[in-house]
């Protein structure tokens, strides 16, 4: 296939013995043809495109030797090296446009440029023989930035102070100059690199070559290429122009002419043979490059490689890309020959006998790598060439240490070759030879040979990051075919010039910062902060030397951003001049006046972070502040940094600080007048150090761009130093302090710094206004908008009829309903929103009268009002947690305190909605939040401990005390001065003096500190001082008028006063709150009229006959008939149902049968013992179809046709099985129901009409068959035919009826047709009404006129529905109803049910209201309709209405003596506690006449707790006064309180005194399971249970140990006091004591507790037991 001889004697395409090409060209004996038929000079088989092969061993596609190139061009053995695109060829070449050029044998650059050419050609073939570079079309052009950079000056306009001004601008980009406007910055940079203008002092002696062919003369010694190789002689430019260097600086030493990329002419020509681009060398590479011998693309032998690199002639082996190897040679990827074979990743090869490529077919079995190099037997390397043996080889980067692993960039290495085949003793990626450690890519030495990646010739010893110079002593191979001749170039060795200020070692960077700064100052490419060097590792991560070099390279072309030159000032509109702000960051920084002179100054201490963690977590001590300003110059950081000055100068901004000005209006008194200054700085919101200073209006009007500090930075540093070292301000307690702390005003430097980082002034925005109504802030909005208000101006005022809404995004809004008139109002200045706060009319002087303008009732919505956790300082936004905390209730309390009306709180958005009557300030203060869900007052008491002031303070400490709050003066009630008397020593005062700090937890109620709102405060406290026997009351918010002098307070370290001593005996008493509904009467009442006339206005006489109505069970009411006569009247409510009792029971049995009961669990709404259980909740399963059928059967059995109709309608509207097409089927069933009901609603005479009107009457009843018969009878065959056809195919007949109507209309005969007949045609044509014009009059006919809603809806369902469902027909019917053409279905139960089925959002309450019968107390139909709708899934009825329905129906059943079913109905109540209360109340009412069997049935059938039934019976048994029965019922009801009372007071004492041990044992057995639940059981009832146990133990002869335990327990309980015990209990205890006495006496173990027994009992004991030997006892009586 590819030209090889086959084993079967023929080629792949049927050729003879000679090889043929891929497309079947015949190959002669001594002539082979390439892909396009060109003859090749050598005989033998051919390669992929016809290349001949001489040796059996070949590459993957057949290695060729001495044959043609990839396209069959013959190649002659030469010593020249061709370039990538065909440079350096002996034969005549043609350019892309056919121009020929001659080339001498020489090596070429990357794109075919010959080195040392005297004549080159342009892209179109024109010859350029002059030393100067050629342009695109051969013309001589100026390349590079030879002209000095001068920024073009132009003009522009901008808005300043509301006016348009013209300013001058400079385009700080070199490509904006007219001389470079046709090139980009990258093109200019490449041209400068080609011309070796990369840094000052390159030393060129002639003009540099441009990008497209400009020639360069020979560089002087010391110049270097891009990657560090110096250029010794002339080279060609990028596209063929002669120059001293290749595009990337590689040196060559020959002087031959080669062609450029697009066919630049070369000097020499030879036999015709074409390359890819038209070059015809004798033998060429892929792109026409000449080589010594022909080679295929993948089978290169001694010719050129894929890119034309020349190799020594070999006989065996070839790599994937045509590299062939001799015994001791191997080629690289691009054909470069190395001394030893190398793998792609640096594996060294031994000298194989025969080599083949990695993909050869039939090659020798020698091991080779993927590119044809044989693998070494004992060597191996890592990805970058690290080997474990000492064999020679090269890595991808040319580094191969003898014994090392990992990445080796330039370490000392043995002889290696680089990634592209160049042989060197050891080098980096670009072929630099290194004999000693070097830079990143390898410092070179003089001993090895090697080339850079792009043909760089290595220089001598020193080497930098990219700028190492080497001196070649042997021929070099470039990466892409440049062959350096073996000649010695004498070069002057000079000091290496760094590319961008970087020398041979990266570690020397810090020593060369002077050079870097000079380059930054003189960089010609403007200012770009994106290219600044970043030294912050937190932002850019780990910076590599490569990235550092790239940044420095770009930075060399940029102007210093922090320069204070005029250019930087002129360009301040691009970058705000933040350098002045950043220059004053830290007080520890001492710098010169010119900040830009020390670019890399590094502060060794971090500036103070006052931003509450907003800065980075760590601070890099090596990070320059100026560099940090570039990367961290966000608005937040600028605010933080500029706030440092504010805190140093003692200034604060009260505008943007939460809780500063906002708290000035609070009713809040801090009775601790003195607070430490450090605590003030930490806690006081007024002196928040993080805040920016207030910016005045004049400063805001200044342009942000041109604002500069008004004070020299050096002076500002000195001023701050003095401010820090000054003494604290004196505290003058004799003058009333301001509402804010008396701090110094904002300094000029601080104001300027703040203005620099502030947002642009408001005047730069074009403010839109309507009649003076405007919004100047972008985050405020209004509804309607300002533009819409322009259309609402009347008489010079904006009149809003539908109200006004003003809001701020993410803060809230205020809505004023009704008519609002505005004029000349800045809405965002009157309505001010802050976090959780709104103020309308912040200036009290500008406030409108109440009820006018915006000082009127409104609805306020504050956003993001969530609870803030005190520990984590995070907002709690979880709805469940907010509910648990009670946040909504807290907001309700705060709303009441503010005098507003709470409306809503939406936890999802934190929206707090309330209504106010007038405006001042409303909101929620930070300290108004509850602590962990506790009420605010409790949180205050828990979080506000007593503040203790130590008396052992110095005068300096007293001076540091700052008064925090304005305190109102007060006068002593007895006008006595508080005298401070001196005492000898402070020890007389004791240790500490507590002073109560009380904070009134009141919300922002908009009130002032007056007495009118005093009653709204919670926990008002008064402080009482006892002075000289008089009591003086100091009201809250006030202070004694005579305040102590400062001198006396300063001497507290040595002495104190009696006033301070009295503080130890401080009495804090709660102030009595006035009653909420106290009657405030006037003076003493006086009799104004006579006694006789006073009877006329006597209220008692007016209501003399009124009496309280008492409701009894079963709905019976009782009232008195006085004063007319002494009678008690009874009345009953008619609760009879429309159905009989059997029907009631049968219907309820259906519900009981299909219902499901489920216990919801214990009630969480009550903790009482009686409410611990709940009744079962009744619900219904989804299988409700059986309910419909049974309801219909019960109604039919009772003869209630109306109920049957309702149940059938519900069954048709809500089918249980909904198969495909169920909607249409439902329409059919509803149509059938409508037919039945329509017949019932029409009189019999109309339905039996046989006249011509009878057709229409039958159509209105839905009977089309009968209408057809009547039409036949009345001689209307056409109508009859069409009616009959419509029953079969309604769609077709619709068009026929319409056509008939159109025909009559055209003939103007519509008015002559009978009305009923015309209605038939209109209806059957699919219309419910029809209109037409005739003789200038409008005529219309309405088919629904005169019909009830059932017939009207039936016409839509029967004839106008087509194949749609019920919803479409109902919608069409509703349109006719709304248009007044049809009767409405509202108010009728079937109509409401149909509406509910078609409109699911319809109210269920409205449907049930229509189910009420004639008797308003009959809820039978309503409740059962509800049960059906509930089972279907309509559960949108409000719980209140639902509960009321259940209670009413239950009362009806109770009045009918159906108590069991009444309980069942009550179990449908959804609320647990309400359901339990209703059921228990009903049980109490029916317990009187209900026997135990009925209760057992109720408990079993409806799962009523037995405890509830027993409790109901217990209430009834109280009237019987049977303690035994009561005790049994109390135990059954688990009424623990009653169990304990009955057992202790009656049951147990009676059994003990009577000696009825069996009854006592039975009672104790009943109580024993509940002993742990009965309160106070151990001190009361356990005496009797222990006594019962003692009797059992004695009777059973138990062990003595058990008896002793019971005796000790019993004796202990007998010592309980007997004050509250009745006589029976005392007697029982004496009886128990007597038994214990007898037992102890028998055991001879009487204790001294016998004193407990009475005298008589003891005498009785002694009398009865005289044989015990009384003489042994000495009994003392008290």
UniProtKB/Swiss-Prot annotation:
Q: What does this protein do?
A: Nup98 and Nup96 play a role in the bidirectional transport across the nucleoporin complex (NPC). Required for the nuclear import of hcp-4 during mitotic prophase, this step is essential for centrosome assembly and resolution. Regulates nucleoporin npp-5 localization to the nuclear membrane during interphase and to kinetochores during metaphase. Has a role in P granule integrity; may promote the 'liquid phase' of P granules by increasing the number of interacting RNA-protein complexes. Binds nos-2 mRNA, probably indirectly, and promotes its accumulation in P granules.
- Give the phenotype of cells or organisms lacking this gene: RNAi-mediated knockdown results in embryonic lethality. Two-cell embryos appear to lack nuclei and pronuclei. Also causes severe defects in mitosis. Chromosome condensation is severely impaired during prophase. Centrosome assembly during prophase and prometaphase and their subsequent resolution are impaired which results from impaired nuclear import of hcp-4. Impaired sister chromatin segregation. Loss of nucleoporin npp-5 localization to the nuclear membrane during interphase and to kinetochores during metaphase. Irregular nuclear membrane distribution of nucleoporin npp-13.
Signal peptide range equals none
Post-translationally, this protein is described as follows, namely:
The Nup98 and Nup96 chains are autoproteolytically processed from a single precursor protein.
Q: What is the lineage of its organism?
A: Eukaryota, Metazoa, Ecdysozoa, Nematoda, Chromadorea
**GO terms of biological process kind:** cell division; embryo development ending in birth or egg hatching; mitotic chromosome centromere condensation; mRNA transport; nuclear pore localization; nucleus organization; P granule organization; post-transcriptional tethering of RNA polymerase II gene DNA at nuclear periphery
Q: Which GO terms describe its cellular component?
A: cytoplasm; kinetochore; nuclear envelope; nuclear membrane; nuclear pore; nuclear pore cytoplasmic filaments; P granule
The active-site annotation reads 920
Entry protein name: Nuclear pore complex protein Nup98-Nup96
Q: Where is the composition biased (Polar residues)?
A: 306-329, 456-473, 615-628
Provide the alphabetized UniProt keywords.
Autocatalytic cleavage, Cell cycle, Cell division, Chromosome, Hydrolase, Membrane, Mitosis, mRNA transport, Nuclear pore complex, Nucleus, Protease, Protein transport, RNA-binding, Serine protease, Translocation, Transport
Kindly list the residue ranges recorded as spanning the membrane. none
Which Gene Ontology terms cover its molecular function? nuclear localization sequence binding; RNA binding; serine-type peptidase activity; structural constituent of nuclear pore
Q: Does the keyword Protein transport apply?
A: yes
- In this chain, the stretch annotated as Disordered covers 1-41, 68-100, 301-366, 441-473, 603-631
Give residue spans, biased composition: Low complexity: 1-11, 23-38, 73-83, 345-366
Keyword Membrane part of the UniProt annotation: yes
The Gly residues compositionally biased stretches are 12-22
Q: What species is this protein from? A: Caenorhabditis elegans
Q: Which PROSITE patterns match?
A: NUP_C (PS51434)
On the tree of life, the source organism's domain of life is: Eukaryota
Q: Which residues bear the site annotation Cleavage?
A: 919-920
The EC designation for this entry is: 3.4.21.-
Q: How does it assemble?
A: Part of the NPC.
Recorded family membership: Belongs to the nucleoporin GLFG family.
**Ranges where the Peptidase S59 domain occurs:** 777-919
Q: Which Pfam families match?
A: Nucleoporin2, Nucleoporin_FG, Nup96, Nup98_GLEBS
């Amino acid at each position: 296939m590819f030209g090889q001889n086959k084993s079967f004697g023929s080629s792949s395409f049927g050729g003879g013995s000679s090889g043929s090409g891929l497309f079947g060209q015949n190959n002669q004996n001594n002539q082979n043809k390439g892909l396009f038929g060109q003859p090749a000079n050598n005989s033998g088989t051919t390669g992929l495109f016809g290349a001949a092969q001489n040796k059996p061993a070949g590459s993957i596609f057949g290695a060729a030797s001495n044959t043609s190139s990839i396209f069959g061009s013959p190649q002659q053995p030469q010593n020249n090296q061709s370039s990538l695109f065909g440079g350096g060829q002996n034969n005549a070449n043609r350019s892309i446009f056919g121009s020929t050029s001659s080339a001498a044998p020489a090596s070429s650059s990357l794109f075919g440029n010959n080195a040392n050419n005297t004549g080159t050609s342009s892209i179109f073939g024109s010859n350029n023989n002059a030393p100067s570079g050629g342009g695109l079309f051969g013309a001589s052009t100026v390349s590079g930035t030879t002209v000095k950079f001068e920024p073009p000056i132009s003009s522009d306009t901008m808005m300043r102070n509301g006016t348009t001004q013209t300013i001058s601008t400079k385009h700080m980009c070199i490509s904006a100059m007219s001389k470079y406007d046709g090139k980009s910055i990258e093109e200019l940079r490449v041209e400068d690199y080609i011309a070796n203008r990369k840094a000052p002092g390159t030393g060129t002696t002639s003009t540099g070559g441009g990008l497209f062919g400009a020639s360069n003369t020979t560089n002087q010694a010391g110049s270097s290429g891009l990657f560090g190789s110096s250029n010794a002689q002339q080279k060609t430019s990028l596209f063929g122009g002669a120059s001293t260097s290749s595009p990337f600086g590689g040196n060559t030493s020959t002087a031959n002419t080669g062609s450029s990329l697009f066919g630049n002419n070369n000097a020499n020509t030879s036999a015709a043979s074409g390359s890819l681009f038209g070059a015809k060398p004798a033998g060429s590479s892929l792109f026409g490059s000449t080589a010594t011998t022909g080679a295929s693309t993948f089978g290169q032998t001694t010719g050129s490689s894929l890119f034309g690199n020349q190799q020594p002639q070999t006989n065996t082996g070839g790599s994937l890309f045509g590299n062939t190897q001799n015994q001791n040679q191997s080629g690289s990827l691009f054909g470069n020959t190395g001394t030893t074979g190398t793998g792609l990743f640096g594996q060294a090869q031994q000298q194989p006998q025969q080599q083949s490529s990695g993909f050869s077919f039939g090659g020798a079995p020698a091991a080779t790598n993927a590119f044809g190099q044989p693998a070494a037997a004992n060597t191996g390397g890592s990805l970058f060439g690290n080997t474990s043996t000492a064999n020679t080889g090269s890595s991808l980067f040319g580094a191969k240490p003898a014994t090392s692993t990992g990445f080796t960039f330039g370490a000392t290495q043995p002889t290696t070759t680089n990634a592209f085949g160049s042989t060197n003793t050891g080098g980096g990626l670009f072929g630099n030879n290194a004999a000693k450690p070097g830079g990143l890519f390898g410092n070179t030495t003089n001993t090895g040979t090697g080339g850079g990646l792009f043909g760089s010739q290595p220089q001598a010893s020193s080497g930098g990051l990219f700028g190492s110079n080497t001196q070649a002593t042997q021929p070099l191979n470039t990466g892409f075919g440049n062959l350096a001749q073996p000649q010695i170039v004498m070069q002057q060795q000079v000091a290496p010039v760094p590319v961008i200020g970087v020398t041979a070692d990266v570690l020397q960077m810090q020593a060369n910062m002077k050079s870097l700064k000079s380059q930054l100052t003189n960089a010609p490419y403007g200012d770009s902060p994106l290219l600044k060097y970043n030294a912050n590792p937190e932002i850019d991560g780990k910076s590599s030397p490569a990235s550092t070099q790239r940044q420095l390279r770009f930075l060399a072309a940029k102007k210093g951003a922090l320069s204070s030159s005029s250019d930087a000032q002129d360009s301040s509109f691009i970058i705000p001049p933040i350098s002045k702000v950043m220059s004053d960051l830290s007080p520890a920084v001492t710098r010169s006046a010119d900040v830009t002179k020390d670019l890399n100054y590094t502060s060794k201490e971090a500036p103070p972070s006052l931003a509450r963690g907003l800065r980075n977590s760590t601070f890099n001590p090596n990070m320059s502040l100026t560099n940090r300003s570039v990367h961290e110059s966000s608005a937040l950081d600028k605010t933080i940094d500029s706030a440092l000055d504010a805190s140093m100068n003692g200034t604060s901004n009260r505008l943007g600080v939460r809780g500063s000005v906002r708290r000035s209006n609070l009713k809040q008194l801090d009775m601790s007048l003195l607070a430490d200054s450090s605590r003030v700085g930490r806690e006081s919101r007024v002196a928040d150090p993080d805040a920016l200073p207030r910016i005045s209006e004049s400063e805001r009007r200044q342009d942000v761009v041109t604002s500069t500090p008004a004070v020299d930075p050096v002076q500002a540093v000195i001023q701050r130093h003095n401010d820090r070292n000054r003494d604290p301000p004196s505290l003058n307690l004799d003058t009333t302090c301001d509402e804010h702390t008396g701090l110094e005003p904002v300094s000029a430097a601080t104001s300027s710094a703040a203005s620099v980082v502030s947002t642009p002034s408001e005047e730069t925005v074009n403010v839109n206004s309507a009649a003076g109504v405007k919004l100047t802030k972008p985050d405020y909005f209004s509804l309607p908008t300002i533009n819409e208000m322009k259309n609402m101006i009347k008489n010079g005022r904006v009149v809003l009829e539908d109200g006004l809404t003003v809001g701020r995004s993410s803060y809230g809004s205020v809505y004023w309903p009704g008519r609002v008139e505005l004029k000349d109002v800045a809405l965002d200045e009157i309505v001010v929103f802050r976090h959780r706060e709104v103020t309308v009319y912040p200036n009290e002087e500008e406030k409108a009268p109440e009820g006018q303008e915006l000082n009127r009732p409104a609805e306020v919505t504050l956003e993001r009002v969530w609870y803030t956790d005190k520990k984590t300082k995070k907002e709690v936004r979880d709805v469940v947690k907010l509910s648990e905390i009670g946040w909504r209730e807290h907001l309700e309390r705060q709303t009441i305190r503010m005098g507003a009306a709470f409306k809503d709180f939406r936890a999802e958005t934190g929206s707090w909605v309330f209504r106010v009557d007038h405006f001042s300030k409303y909101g929620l203060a930070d300290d108004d939040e509850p602590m962990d869900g506790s009420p605010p007052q409790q949180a205050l008491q828990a979080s506000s401990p007593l503040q203790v002031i130590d008396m052992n303070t110095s005068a300096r400490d007293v001076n540091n005390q700052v008064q925090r709050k304005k305190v109102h003066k007060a006068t002593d009630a007895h006008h006595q001065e508080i005298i401070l008397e001196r005492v000898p020593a402070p020890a007389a005062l004791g240790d500490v003096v507590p002073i109560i700090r009380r904070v009134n937890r009141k919300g922002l109620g908009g009130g002032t500190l007056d007495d009118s709102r005093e009653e709204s405060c919670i926990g008002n406290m008064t402080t009482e001082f006892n002075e000289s026997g008089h009591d003086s009351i100091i009201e809250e918010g006030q202070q004694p008028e005579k305040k102590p002098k400062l001198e006396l307070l300063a001497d507290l370290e040595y002495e104190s006063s009696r006033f301070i001593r009295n503080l130890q005996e401080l009495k804090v008493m709660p102030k009595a709150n006035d009653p909420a509904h106290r009657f405030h009467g006037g003076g003493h009442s006086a009799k104004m009229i006579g006694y006789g006339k006073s009877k006329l206005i006597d209220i008692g006489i007016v209501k003399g006959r009124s009496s309280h109505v008492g409701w009894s069970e079963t709905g019976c009411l009782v009232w008195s008939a006085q004063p007319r006569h002494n009678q008690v009247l009874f009345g009953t409510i008619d609760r009879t149902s429309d159905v009989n009792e059997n029907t009631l029971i049968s219907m309820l049995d259906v519900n009981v049968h299909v219902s499901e009961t489920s216990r919801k669990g214990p009630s969480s709404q009550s903790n009482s013992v009686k409410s611990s259980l709940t009744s079962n909740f009744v619900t219904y399963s989804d299988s409700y179809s059986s309910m419909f059928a049974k309801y219909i059967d019960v109604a039919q059995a009772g003869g209630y046709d109306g109920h049957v109709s309702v149940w059938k309608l519900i069954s048709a509207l809500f089918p249980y099985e909904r198969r495909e097409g169920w909607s249409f089927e439902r329409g059919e069933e509803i149509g059938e129901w409508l037919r039945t009901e329509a017949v019932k609603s029409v009189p019999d005479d109309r339905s039996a009409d046989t006249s011509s009107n009878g057709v229409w009457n039958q159509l209105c009843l839905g009977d089309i068959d009968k209408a057809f018969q009547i039409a036949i009878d009345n001689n209307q065959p056409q109508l009859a035919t069409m009616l009959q056809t419509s029953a079969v195919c309604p769609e077709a007949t619709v068009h026929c009826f319409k056509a008939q109507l159109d025909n009559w209309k055209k003939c103007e005969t519509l008015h002559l047709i009978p009305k009923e007949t015309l209605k038939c045609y209109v209806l059957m044509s699919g219309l419910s009404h029809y209109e037409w014009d005739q003789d200038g009059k409008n005529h219309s006919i309405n088919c629904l006129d005169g019909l009830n809603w059932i017939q009207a809806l039936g016409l839509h369902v029967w004839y106008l529905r087509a194949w749609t469902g019920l919803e479409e027909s109902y919608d069409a019917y509703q349109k006719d109803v709304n248009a007044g053409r049809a009767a409405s279905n509202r108010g009728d139960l079937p109509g409401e049910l149909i509406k509910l089925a078609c409109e699911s959002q319809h109210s269920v309450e409205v449907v049930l209201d229509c189910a009420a019968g004639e008797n308003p107390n009959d809820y039978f139909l309503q409740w059962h309709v509800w049960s059906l709708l509930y089972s279907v899934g309509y559960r949108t009825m409000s719980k209140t209405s639902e509960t009321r329905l259940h209670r009413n129906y239950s009362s009806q059943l109770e009045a009918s003596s159906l108590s069991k079913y009444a309980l069942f109905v009550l179990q449908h109540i959804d609320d647990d506690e309400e359901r339990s209360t209703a059921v228990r109340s009903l049980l109490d009412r029916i317990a009187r006449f209900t026997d135990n069997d009925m209760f057992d049935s109720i408990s079993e059938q409806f799962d009523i707790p037995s405890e509830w039934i027993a409790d109901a019976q217990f209430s009834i048994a109280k009237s019987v006064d049977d303690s035994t029965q009561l005790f049994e019922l109390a135990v059954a009801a688990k009424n623990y309180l009653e169990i304990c009372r009955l057992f202790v007071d009656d049951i147990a004492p009676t059994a003990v005194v009577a000696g009825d041990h069996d009854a006592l044992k039975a009672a104790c057995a009943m109580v024993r399971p509940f002993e742990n639940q009965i309160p106070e059981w151990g001190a009361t009832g356990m005496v009797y249970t222990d006594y019962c146990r003692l009797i059992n133990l004695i009777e059973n002869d138990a062990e003595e140990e058990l008896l002793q335990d019971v005796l000790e327990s019993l004796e202990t309980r007998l010592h309980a006091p007997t004050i509250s015990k009745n006589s029976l209990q005392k007697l029982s205890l004496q009886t128990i004591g007597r038994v214990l006495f007898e037992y102890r006496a028998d055991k001879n173990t009487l204790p001294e507790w016998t004193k407990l027994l009475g005298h008589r009992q003891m005498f009785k004991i002694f009398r009865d037991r005289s044989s015990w030997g009384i003489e042994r006892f000495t009994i003392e009586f008290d």
